[in-house]
Amino acid sequence: NVVTGKRYIKKLVMDGIVDGWDDPRLVSIAALRRRGFTPESIKMFVELCGVSKAQSSVCYDMLEYCIREDLKLKRPRMMAVLDPVKLIIDNYPEEQMEELEIENNLPFGRELYINRDDFMENPPRKYFRLFPGNEVRLMGAYFVTCTGCEKDEAGNVTAVHCTYDPETKCGSGFTGRKVKGTIHWVAAKTAFRAQVRLYENIIDEEKGVYNEDGSLNLNPNSLTVLDDCYLEPALKEAKAYDSYQFVRTGFFCADCRDSKPGAPVFNRIVSLKSSFKLPKPEDCSKTL
């Protein structure tokens, strides 16, 4: 369920729950545009909905399906680490930096950032990413083997250590070796820090749309702001409404209101995957 009534939206704006009529959690045209929805995706959604004389509901997932289908073949794939932890390659030359022969010629060095959930000290079964003794592929770069980690006084991992095999550059030199895990990364020296915003439905569907007093039952986690994300250098030039696929994460758009030259702010448009398969409207659990 999403909020479409003007009376409810006005109250959300007046109470400061959303930052305006174009807040990306809403479904006005201005809000969808700010979030990164394209005209083609909205047209596709309208065509799939069709016209019905009877009262009916439409899957909200269908709207996300349309934008995902429109963007997946159009937008460049970029490296972005949203929950970073440092990865130190102990046997890589300390001052050396190289440009890999991959998209955007991404810089590579001794210290990288990887996603925090790409390392576990005591992993469960079928976890194929970094853990002590395991080898993984750094996307577009080398194979690395985890040797350990550093922790702070609270027991939180502050850095992960590994060694690399120089013969495996860009996917070569590993005949006979099976590496199941591939993770993305950015170089610590060249990546820039940026804010990324993750959006969910503004209505808490598990508790119902309305409270007993008739007010909306709002989702307290409808907006998550990540201030310590590290992105590849090319994304620094992003302008308002520019959209990209962040590898293994989702599709993101530079915010038209808060982005500044050299300091973009990114809104998540939609995640990469969904189980949605164009069901009949009456079978949907989420309605628009």
Residue ranges and their predicted role:
Residues 1-288:
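Catalytic adenosine-cofactor/nucleotide-binding cores of aminoacyl-tRNA synthetases and other
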